[in-house]
């Protein structure tokens, strides 16, 4: 079985060079709406307009007094909601928020008043202010035990760490989630995607072997990762000179016509010295574009950096017929505008977008949700632009 022998396969390095450009760029894996930042910023602006500066200052002074551990005053839900949507990018406000959260969490342990879930909202505040270090510190603070125990909180924190290049910290957060033994799925799809993205960006032997172990664990548990997780793992395998693993991994996706999958497959084949097998893939997109899954027509493109790798692989073969056929295919791709200047790395790291649909199910699994109520709401699904992400 492939999964059981995967870690051994990871050690079979076939080539000494990297084949993908692993560019570090400050971008998130979720669009703002997908993690609820749009709603957070809406209410933030609403509060900013609702209160005058003197009123805000008076509120801060009162809350600073109430948050004192020696004070008998309580921090109520509305108090904390207001400061979380009011806090600015300064030490005074951030310290006040921290003090209020700790007191609120302590006074409510064992008995929750109301049904407002603060963890995701607080993480959105830190995301908005771009404070990954503070967010991580509070996440690990024993005084905040139970405060961030929500799937949404983990995903927002990990995405914040991702855009700031803190990939090791993402793996640390995931290990912490495992140790807490929370009542959530063993392999949450969104969390696993961020973990495999971090391993891809780290691009080290250790992180790749860790990714291999996680992949094997998921396969043995019967878990089906989302396509974005699969492509991160496959690209990581290519960068770690294991294109044979990349080819095996992407076969788990039923529809092989997605842009990222085709590009990765071509790179892997070239890296294995099987450029003759890559030519039919390049040639296949020259036919008339067909709608995918009943949706709109999707132009089947190849990345410029992938095409350059194909050219380099062809030169190593020194085969005249191969060169002529490749030139013919590439000329047609150019004429049809089917070679994109977008890099494969950019495709891999493109944002997951939100698609809304009416639903009345529980909101706990929704990244953008803040309340735990039974009233109808628009459930958010996370998809790549125009195509379904879940397999």
Q: What function would you assign to each model-found segment?
A:
Residues 1-391:
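A basic, Ser/Thr-enriched alpha-helical scaffold prevalent
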